[in-house]
Amino acid sequence: MAGLKQHSGLVVPLDAANVDTDAIIPKQFLQAITRVGFGKHLFHEWRYLDAEETRPNPEFVLNFPQYQGATILLARKNLGCGSSREHAPWALADYGFKVMIAPSFADIFYNNSLNNHMLPIKLSEQEVDEIFHWVWANPGKQIHVDLEAKTVTVGDKVYHFELDEFRRHCLLEGLDNIGLTLQHEDAIAAYEKKIPAFLR
């Protein structure tokens, strides 16, 4: 899996707090257990005017022409609250988001996002508000995220964020739980050789 070292992308300014996982991906779309195919249902209730998803809501920000192809989601506090369903980050990732920026995230959603190789960045409410105003004033312009330096560059301003070093290492190297285990493959093989045959 490719690592996430630096990323430049368009930002969708979702000007809402307490966006829960039911809003991100409604329960009627949770039958599948694979990670693909959820992107088209992302924010279903807000994004479409009909249940069949044939009539996009022109007033929902994800449908605005200037934000098509966006890979960074900007939101207010407590993003991903509600149930612990992992389908929420699956839907965001399948849509194409790689980075999320908010003042705070629900704990389980935050961890699930990292496990699915998306970067949730916590900045202060004032900093997030500044970025909202910049995005509104600069449609079509990208911002730059540098995970190695732990910075977000918006126009001529640089914001610094914190991330647990273990989580940062996993994102930089593109490692999931299996990948982490395989980093110790030689040590595991050496240990297995020491185990008596009848215990193998």
UniProtKB/Swiss-Prot annotation:
EC number(s) stated in the UniProt entry for this protein: 4.2.1.33
Catalytic activity field: (2R,3S)-3-isopropylmalate = (2S)-2-isopropylmalate
GO terms, molecular function: 3-isopropylmalate dehydratase activity
UniProtKB keywords: Amino-acid biosynthesis, Branched-chain amino acid biosynthesis, Leucine biosynthesis, Lyase
One Pfam family of this chain: Aconitase_C
Segment forming the signal sequence: none
Known role: Catalyzes the isomerization between 2-isopropylmalate and 3-isopropylmalate, via the formation of 2-isopropylmaleate.
Protein name stated in the entry: 3-isopropylmalate dehydratase small subunit
Source organism of this protein record: Actinobacillus succinogenes (strain ATCC 55618 / DSM 22257 / CCUG 43843 / 130Z)
